[in-house]
């Protein structure tokens, strides 16, 4: 009995000491700097933005890319990396969000971005001279608390100042990796607090002398691999032809890393030249798989009404009737257990200091 009383006394003392420690932490670092998981103040539902591809949203498991996180999209040249990120920008703008594009490659095609649905008039763009400048601009934008999405294109083009000011043949090993490591350490906490999504586009390099395993690696060291909540590997796997003319690419995206849902899922979609990801084609294919769209012979129908003979005609019908396309997409999302399309981007919080 005495042991029980003594145990209860120690427990009460521990609780008192813990309460004092928590109070001290909150006083020093602000309210919300530490909390219990069961308190309900921590956001259980992850806010997402669609990638513009229904199949990829489903493969990500939460209905899109998570906000308040770092995302890396990498792949070979002309695989669709910039197209995919511009589609995400267009989707965020549809929700009323503010987007910024850090064009370190100095290669953004504004006309193409407009064709993909990006409101280029309201897109913030920066073409920094050095890697340090790019990451400082990113940090300032995130800290403002008024930006919903920032794209950095690309990690390979974030050249350290010392390299730009040095001679052409100078050997400066590890400078870019150090720059990325320092920049990401500084950024991650603020990104989470402001609910800003930051997408890094990256390129692939070949490691020399690799006998076993993949010789492929991404630029900028290992920091981004650790800090990224989602890593997407995008590849062109074929061509789409209309007669003899190539009109697009067949694309595969693998979710290589995912901290918000099970990883290693894959998505396949078409990227049409001048149009971007064929959303309507995906809605038809996934709608048929989920038995929401009926297919009889060459005819496609929805709710008992025929929407087109052949996939091209059905795709055209959905392009002309976006409300029906959205309705089918939301039904597919619900059937597969991912979040339906949102309507509001949500106001990010301002960060002090």
UniProtKB/Swiss-Prot annotation:
Q: List residues binding ATP.
A: 75-82
Gene3D superfamilies given in the database record:
P-loop containing nucleotide triphosphate hydrolases
Q: Which is an annotated Pfam family here?
A: RecA
Keyword hit for ATP-binding: yes
Quote the cellular component terms of the Gene Ontology held in the record.
cytosol
**GO terms classed as biological process:** DNA recombination; DNA repair; SOS response
What the record says about family reads: Belongs to the RecA family.
NCBIfam families cross-referenced by the UniProt entry: tigrfam_recA
Supply the name of the protein: Protein RecA
Encoded by which gene? recA
């Amino acid at each position: 009995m005495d042991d029980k009383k003594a145990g209860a006394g120690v427990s009460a003392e521990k609780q008192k000491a813990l309460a004092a420690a928590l109070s001290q932490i909150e006083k020093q670092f602000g309210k919300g700097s530490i909390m219990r998981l069961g308190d309900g103040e921590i956001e259980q539902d992850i806010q997402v933005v669609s990638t513009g591809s229904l199949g990829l949203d489903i493969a990500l498991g939460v209905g899109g890319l998570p906000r308040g996180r770092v995302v890396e999209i990498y792949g070979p040249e002309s695989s669709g990396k910039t197209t995919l990120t511009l589609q995400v920008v267009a989707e965020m703008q549809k929700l009323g969000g503010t987007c910024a594009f850090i064009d370190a490659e100095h290669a953004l095609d504004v006309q193409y971005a407009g064709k993909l649905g990006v409101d280029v008039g309201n897109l913030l763009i920066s073409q920094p001279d050095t890697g340090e400048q790019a990451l400082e601009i990113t940090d300032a934008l995130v800290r403002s608390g008024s930006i919903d999405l920032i794209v950095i294109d690309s990690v390979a083009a974030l050249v350290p100042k010392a390299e730009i000011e040095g001679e052409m043949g100078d050997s400066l090993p590890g400078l870019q990796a150090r720059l990325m490591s320092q920049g990401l350490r500084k950024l991650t906490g603020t990104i989470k607090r402001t609910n800003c999504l930051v997408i890094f586009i990256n390129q692939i390099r070949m490691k020399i002398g690799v006998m076993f395993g993949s010789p492929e690696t991404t630029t900028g060291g290992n920091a981004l691999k650790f800090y990224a909540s989602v890593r997407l590997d995008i590849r062109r796997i074929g061509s789409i032809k209309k007669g003899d003319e190539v009109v697009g690419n067949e694309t595969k995206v693998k979710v290589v890393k995912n901290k918000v849902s099970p990883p290693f899922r894959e998505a396949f979609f078409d990227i049409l030249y001048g149009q971007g990801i064929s959303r309507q084609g995906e809605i038809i294919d996934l709608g048929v798989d989920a038995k929401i769209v009926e297919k009889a012979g060459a005819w496609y129908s929805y709710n008992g009404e025929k929407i087109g003979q052949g996939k091209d005609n059905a795709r055209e019908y959905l392009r002309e009737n976006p409300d029906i396309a959205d309705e089918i997409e939301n039904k597919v999302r619900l059937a597969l257990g991912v979040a339906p399309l949102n309507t509001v981007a949500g106001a990010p919080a301002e960060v002090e200091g």
